[in-house]
Amino acid sequence: MTALDTLRGKYIEAIASAADEAALEEVRLAALGKKGEISLKMRELGQMSPEERQTTGAALNRLRDEIDASLRARKQGLADAALDARLKTEWLDVTLPGRPRRAGTIHPVSQVMAELTAIFSDMGFAVAEGPQVESDWFNFDALNIPPEHPARQEHDTFFMARAEGDDRPPHVLRTHTSPVQIRAMQAQGAPIRVIAPGRVYRMDMDQTHTPMFHQVEGLAIDRDISMANLKWVLEEFCRAFFEVPSVELRFRASHFPFTEPSAEVDIRCSWEGGQLRIGEGDGWLEILGSGMVHPKVLAAAGVNPDEWQGFAFGMGIDRIAMLKYGIPDLRAFFESDLRWLRHYGFAALDMPDLAGGLSR
């Protein structure tokens, strides 16, 4: 038996008998450390003849690799044994109930959008969408709001800067969802019935206004449409949305550039104990604006105003959500407060429909 065979037997036995990782590390250092026996023998190769160096060097490399492999295998074996021992002392009762997790809730704005969609879909309205960054033409000119019109200042618009040297009118963050109506008429022509819910932007911030809020606007274009049709649609909407058997609306003459005639719409209500009651009492509450679509708006959208007529209406989604669900501050809608959302939110899978009830 050669000296290397003796060395091999010594360390293979020491590795096999190592009781823990600390003892195994001592064996590794004794064999392969900087001052280990195998490492020292590797240094002696420089003192040997080329023939001896070739033979002994190959044998030492094989021994070193074998010892290293044995060390790794033993280390893994010790780790597996430690894990088995720990698992034998630990146990889990799989019959115990799981930890409760809070279920997510639907934001009131999303809920009200779904309610609006359910109501107007039942009346034959489709949902239309459009870009939130709009051209000056779609947001103003096509809606009978020319550059000199004072309504442009009233909107407190967010204008988007163009590149230096570009003299075209700036794009804007849309101030209403009315541009969607223009795009829908251009794409589909007449007749048409659509609602356009979505985000709009104006530079305003207080308890009842935020720089970004949500609107829904409705449009119906057909032959022989009148204010009577508008009144019926709005009454049916309010009855279904506020979930009351009857409502009474009051139309007050107003002015909007894109409708003629125009009317603000109030709903009969009362306040009792800090709660709003729709359809009863002696009070009136403004909820939306409406009117017959201006002939210039129809013409701008490519619809012949001599052949087609229509009505339009618009309301703030956040506002009617506040009224229906008793939410006092509009700013809370956008503060991402989980406590607020858990209080005012809705069950994720309980989608509103007219048959089962809108809010449950």
Swiss-Prot record:
> EC?
6.1.1.20
Cellular component GO terms, alphabetical:
cytoplasm
Q: Which PROSITE patterns match?
A: AA_TRNA_LIGASE_II
One MF term in the entry's GO annotations: phenylalanine-tRNA ligase activity
Task: Tell me the cofactor note.
Answer: Binds 2 magnesium ions per tetramer.
Compartments where found: Cytoplasm
Binding of Mg(2+), residues = E260
From the UniProt record, list the reaction(s) this protein catalyses: tRNA(Phe) + L-phenylalanine + ATP = L-phenylalanyl-tRNA(Phe) + AMP + diphosphate + H(+)
- Give the protein's cofactors: Mg(2+)
Coiled coil: which residue ranges? none
**Per UniProt, what is one Pfam family of this protein?**
tRNA-synt_2d
* GO annotation, biological process: phenylalanyl-tRNA aminoacylation
Keywords per UniProt: Aminoacyl-tRNA synthetase, ATP-binding, Cytoplasm, Ligase, Magnesium, Metal-binding, Nucleotide-binding, Protein biosynthesis
Give the record's subunit note. Answer: Tetramer of two alpha and two beta subunits.
What family does the Swiss-Prot or TrEMBL record give for this protein?
Answer: Belongs to the class-II aminoacyl-tRNA synthetase family. Phe-tRNA synthetase alpha subunit type 1 subfamily.
Per its record, how is this protein called by name?
Phenylalanine--tRNA ligase alpha subunit
Which source organism? Answer: Cereibacter sphaeroides (strain KD131 / KCTC 12085) (Rhodobacter sphaeroides)
What is the name of the gene encoding this protein?
pheS
